[in-house]
Amino acid sequence: MSQFDNVSVVKKANLYFDGKCVSHTVTFADGTRKTLGVIFPAALTFNTGAPEIMEINAGVCRVRLAGSDEWKTYGAGQQFDVPGNSSFDIEVTETLDYVCHFG
């Protein structure tokens, strides 16, 4: 899906890691929430509350989920799942355009 219709968008950006990750929250009519964002080249660790699906629209990254020693590479058109109440390490080598689906 290249477009989300009938949504509410929070104008104020979510800024993380000194601006290395910037996103906007989008809420759908049914209450579902997603964030649309960009991560600039960096090595970061994110913590999750709810389970997440990270959909990659552009860019390249390597990801290591909590409890794993294995790094996996993801690019445009791919996605990875992160359990709730967990974390993941991400190394972005090409600016990453993503959609984060919660729940």
From Swiss-Prot:
Going by the UniProt record, its keywords in alphabetical order are:
Glycosyltransferase, Transferase
SUPFAM superfamilies, A to Z = RmlC-like cupins
UniProt lists the gene as: ppnP
Task: Say what the protein does.
Answer: Catalyzes the phosphorolysis of diverse nucleosides, yielding D-ribose 1-phosphate and the respective free bases. Can use uridine, adenosine, guanosine, cytidine, thymidine, inosine and xanthosine as substrates. Also catalyzes the reverse reactions.
Q: What transmembrane ranges does the database entry give?
A: none
Q: Which Gene3D superfamilies match?
A: Jelly Rolls
- Which Gene Ontology molecular function entries are recorded, alphabetically? guanosine phosphorylase activity; purine-nucleoside phosphorylase activity; thymidine phosphorylase activity; uridine phosphorylase activity
Swiss-Prot/TrEMBL catalytic activity: a purine D-ribonucleoside + phosphate = a purine nucleobase + alpha-D-ribose 1-phosphate; adenosine + phosphate = alpha-D-ribose 1-phosphate + adenine; cytidine + phosphate = cytosine + alpha-D-ribose 1-phosphate; guanosine + phosphate = alpha-D-ribose 1-phosphate + guanine
User: Which Pfam family is one of this chain's hits?
Assistant: Ppnp
At the top of the EC hierarchy, this enzyme's class is transferase
Q: Any idea what this protein is called?
A: Pyrimidine/purine nucleoside phosphorylase
Is Cytoplasm tagged as a keyword? Answer: no
The record's listing under InterPro entries reads: Ppnp, RmlC-like_jellyroll, RmlC_Cupin_sf
Please give the GO cellular component terms listed in this UniProt entry. Answer: cytosol
Q: Which family does it belong to?
A: Belongs to the nucleoside phosphorylase PpnP family.
